[in-house]
Structure formats: C-alpha cells, structure tokens
C-alpha cells in the first residue's frame, strides 16, 4: 500500500483528496494535516466522514511527515510548499503540490503575479507540470509535481489540439471562464458570503488573474512562440464547476469534420477527456463530482473565429482528481485507479 500524507486536508481540495483516496485500492491515508484543526477528529470537521475517518488531524510538519509516508499532497495556499521544500524531503518522498509554487518556471513572473517571494527556486527546473494528458512520461519519473490550476486545466485541454495544429492565430485567444464558489477556497471572506454570491455573477481579476501566466507559459511551450492571451474569470452562484468559452481567429477556413477529426485524434486515448458530439455544448452538471473534462467547439464562419468550450469539476480534475491521476502515474498504477467516478446528477 502507498502511504499518503495530506497537508491542508481540511480545505475543499484537501477534503476532496480524502474522498477520492478513501476509494483507492492501493492507498492508505496515514496523515491528515491541518494547521487549523490540530488534534481534532477529521469527522468532526467534515461530518460526511462520520464513521468513515476516525483519525485526528496533525500539524503541517512536512519534514516529520516525509519520514512516514511515500507521497505528500500539499493542498495549501501559495508559498507554503516553496517555503518548506528541501532536498532532504525529496530524497525521502514524492511531493504533489496543488498550489502554484512550481507551475511557473520563471521566478520573476511568479513573484510579479503572486506578490510573494519564491523561497525554493532551485526546484523549479525539476518540477514537472502535472497535466497528465501531455506530460505523462515525465510525470512517471518525477519526484516533484506542480499540479495545474483549475482554470488552466480546462482552458488548455479545450484549446490545445487547435493551437498545436496551428489552426488558430496565437495572438487572438480570448478565454471567458466561470467558476463555482469553492474555487475561492474555504477561508472566510466577505466576498464569498451567501448574500454576496447568491443570485449574482461577477467578473474578477480582470486582466490580472494569476492563472493567466500559467496558461500563457504552457501555450508558449506548445507553439514555441510567446503567446499572450486575454483571460477573464467570473464567479457564479454554484458550489463547484468550471465552464470555459474560448475564442480564436482561424488561420484558414476549416470544416466541422476537419476540426472534429483533430480533437478525436488528440483525445481518443484519453479516458478523462470527452469530445462531445456536434451541437452538444459542455455543461458543468454533466461532469460534477468526476474527473472528466467535456470539450466541444463551434465554427463561426461569419466572424472567421472558432469557439472552443470546456466543462469540468474544479475540485476534481481541477485539483484533487488530477493530483491522484499524477500519483497513479508516479507509482506505476493504472491511471484511472480510484478515479472512475460517475458524474453526479441531479
């Protein structure tokens, strides 16, 4: 059995890790880390775990944890993992970081967008960007995984085949994104109170959202060009889910059949990416609670643009599910182990 420790197990992504890993045949969770609930029973924090998890929460001591487990998941705010990472830790244990600390390779870019100093830049080169559909072989050999952000995961998977094939102009990409409130985390914030978000939609982080450089860096690596995008996220009054609607200018006229063949070719062997049939726009309700990403597209010949769409659960494929997918690859397990979660409806 793989011994797992979770730092930040009482956040939304951390709790989702617990839910998924409890169903995993090859895993034993031995450390429920939480600086907010030290010594409190996990099931007292999340009553859905009553009579399922009887263990208590430990502190977030990563050095101590590395002595007891095979892999550590850090479901923590930006800055934590980078502040405690050492070669000694990585020599003992694999680490999957769900924060942004190792996603962006350029230290200056990270510090500029996140507004904090990066405390372990020496590990940036080694860290593997954990988008399994593209970096599978590197993930298998990795000690340190940078689990991708939720918006970048949905955006990249929705757009990747067409940007890779040179179908769209790389300087024309506009991404309109919408997310449920769980994407903002479990911490108490006035902006996330019920009366603030109910019956309301709003754009936020307009032109300044931190996931922008992550998406741009990945597209730049794909195209070997300096790609700049317009990315605007919106908060919508639902618990979970992400919906992406992206726009790109076509380099030439293409038919529906040509584009559909490209998507099918890229994703036919990818269990978790579902290319929908013509006229079926992705919806968040059809992926809720699952590790699936549903993608589709529409060609608008009138404007010479293509509209690319994607939907996924921000806490599963956008966080915990993708992290478990990475763990499976790192330990030579079937990639779908513990992740064949049927979407919940209604």
From Swiss-Prot:
Pathway: Amino-acid biosynthesis; L-arginine biosynthesis; N(2)-acetyl-L-ornithine from L-glutamate: step 3/4
Compartments it resides in: Cytoplasm
Keyword Chloroplast set for record: no
GO cellular component, one term: cytoplasm
Any one GO biological process: L-arginine biosynthetic process
EC number(s) given by UniProt: 1.2.1.38
Pfam families: Semialdhyde_dh, Semialdhyde_dhC_1
Annotated catalysed reactions: N-acetyl-L-glutamate 5-semialdehyde + phosphate + NADP(+) = N-acetyl-L-glutamyl 5-phosphate + NADPH + H(+)
UniProt keyword NADP, yes or no: yes
Alphabetized UniProt keyword annotations: Amino-acid biosynthesis, Arginine biosynthesis, Cytoplasm, NADP, Oxidoreductase
Active site per UniProt: 150
GO molecular function: N-acetyl-gamma-glutamyl-phosphate reductase activity; NAD binding; NADP+ binding
Family of the protein in this entry: Belongs to the NAGSA dehydrogenase family. Type 1 subfamily.
NCBIfam families: argC (TIGR01850)
Protein name per the record: N-acetyl-gamma-glutamyl-phosphate reductase
Record organism: Lachnoclostridium phytofermentans (strain ATCC 700394 / DSM 18823 / ISDg) (Clostridium phytofermentans)
């Amino acid at each position: 059995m793989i011994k797992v420790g979770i730092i930040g197990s009482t956040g939304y992504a951390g709790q989702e890790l617990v839910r998924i890993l409890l169903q995993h045949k090859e895993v034993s969770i031995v450390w429920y880390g939480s600086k907010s609930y030290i010594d409190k029973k996990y099931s007292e924090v999340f009553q859905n775990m009553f009579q399922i998890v009887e263990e208590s929460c430990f502190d977030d001591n990563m050095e101590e944890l590395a002595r007891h487990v095979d892999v550590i998941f850090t479901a923590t705010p930006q800055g934590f993992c980078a502040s405690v990472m050492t070669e000694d830790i990585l020599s003992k244990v694999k680490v999957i970081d769900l924060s942004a600390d190792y996603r962006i390779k350029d230290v200056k870019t990270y510090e500029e967008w996140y507004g904090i100093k990066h405390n372990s830049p020496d590990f940036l080169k080694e860290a593997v960007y954990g988008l399994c559909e593209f970096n599978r072989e590197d993930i298998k050999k990795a000690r340190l995984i940078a689990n991708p952000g939720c918006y970048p995961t949905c955006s990249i998977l929705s757009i990747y085949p067409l940007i890779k094939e040179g179908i769209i102009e790389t300087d024309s990409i506009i991404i309109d994104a919408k997310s449920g409130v769980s994407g903002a985390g479990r911490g108490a914030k006035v902006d996330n109170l019920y009366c603030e978000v109910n019956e309301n939609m709003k754009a936020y982080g307009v032109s300044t959202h931190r996931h922008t450089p992550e998406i741009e860096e990945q597209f730049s690596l794909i195209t070997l060009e300096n790609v700049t995008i317009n990315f605007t996220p919106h908060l919508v009054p639902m618990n979970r889910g992400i919906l992406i609607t992206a726009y790109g200018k076509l380099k030439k006229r293409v038919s529906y059949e040509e584009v559909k063949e490209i998507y099918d070719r890229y994703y036919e062997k990818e269990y978790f990416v579902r290319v929908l049939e013509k006229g079926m726009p992705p919806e968040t309700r059809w992926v809720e609670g699952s590790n699936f990403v549903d993608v589709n597209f529409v060609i608008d010949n009138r404007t010479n643009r293509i509209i690319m769409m994607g939907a996924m659960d921000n806490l599963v494929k956008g966080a915990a599910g993708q992290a478990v997918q990475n763990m499976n690859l790192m330990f030579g397990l079937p990639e779908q182990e513990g992740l064949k979660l049927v979407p919940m409806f209604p």
